[in-house]
A protein has these predicted regions:
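Residues within mature, well-folded domains
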Residues: 1-102
Length: 102
């Protein structure tokens, strides 16, 4: 879920610049893949599509919904296998930075 956890607890070898939540919501599918690269997992579930991206620090789940003729981000979650708070904007920056360095 959306977390505003203390950014001091987030660490990544490619931390990148945090990406504001407002820009993740409303991002079209083309821009999503330009920013984060190829998803490591996709799933269609009724009216939504899940695209999962991964960095060394987190998984970023973007849920896209059909708007007009295309898909657009409506919900985003950051997940961490370790039990700690995870700020979504920092996770998004990490995933984007890792894509650029690949």
């Amino acid at each position: 879920s959306l977390s505003t956890a203390d950014p001091g607890v987030f660490s990544s070898s490619n931390s990148g610049q945090p990406i504001p939540l407002e820009s993740l919501r409303g991002m079209d599918e083309r821009r999503v893949t330009q920013t984060f690269g190829r998803p490591v997992f996709t799933r269609s579930d009724g009216p939504s599509r899940l695209l999962r991206f991964r960095s060394d620090a987190c998984d970023l789940d973007l849920f896209l919904y059909q708007v007009g003729g295309g898909w657009q981000g409506r919900h985003v979650e950051a997940r961490d296998p370790r039990p700690r708070g995870l700020p979504v904007n920092r996770c998004a920056g990490s995933v984007a930075a890792q894509k650029r360095s690949a």
